[in-house]
Amino acid sequence: MPESVISIRNLKISFGALHVLRDVDLDLYRGENLVVLGRSGTGKSVLIKIIIGLLRPDAGTVNVLGQSVTDLDSRDLDALRLKIGFSFQNSALYDSMTVRENLEFPLVRNERNLSRADINKRIEEALDDVGLLQAIDQVPSQLSGGQRKRIGIARTLILNPEIMLYDEPTAGLDPITSIEINNLINEVRERHHTSSIVITHDLTCAKTTGDRVAMLLDGRFERVGTFEDVFDSDDERVQAFYNYNFIDQP
């Protein structure tokens, strides 16, 4: 039986009369890329916020790296979050800082005993990992959207997380750059031995990066398996999602 690094059982959350997640069960296994797929507004981002302790569910359990997220105090939750890397949809870089300073910030905040030489080495290694060492002294406004995504991933990797969470990693990117980001997600897993959840509504991203795909439908994961397994379905909701991505889009 594979080891679960994230285990979710009977998860429920509502906002007023709106039931967002209903009796959700899901596992992220060590070393896998798990794609969480669904339309906008289906609760994908809510799920991520629950996993990292930013939202508290109405019911259910969330265990991350053997710890119950809902039972942790703020100090233990902060310690757990250091083991989880979060790659934001908009990269979340500080515009007034250079790339070097953006990557230095989490290091000096969380690993205060590092020497200047060690800090520089970690920054250069992280940038080399994403193929952008040459951008070290540039500011975000000088970079393309794809480059900013890469720098955001580098900043996330600099603390050596065990788990990576990617929020819509290909959103707003052209097809070629999207392929490059998808390949990078796979490379990160191979080089850093991370376990990852990729939140997306992009089927090409799902097919390229996902060892398994979990499709969120009406607040539940109705379909979980390989990409082919998930879409080998007569469910009209599944087929409508597939056709919209691959047929109706220009």
Regions found by a protein language model. Name each.
Residues 68, 116-134:
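Conserved ABC ATPase "signature" region
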Residues 158-162:
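A short, proline-enriched helix->beta-strand linker immediately N-terminal to the Walker B motif
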Residues 175-177:
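Helix N-cap at the start of a conserved alpha-helix in ABC-type nucleotide-binding domains
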Residues 218-219:
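Conserved ABC ATPase "signature" C-loop
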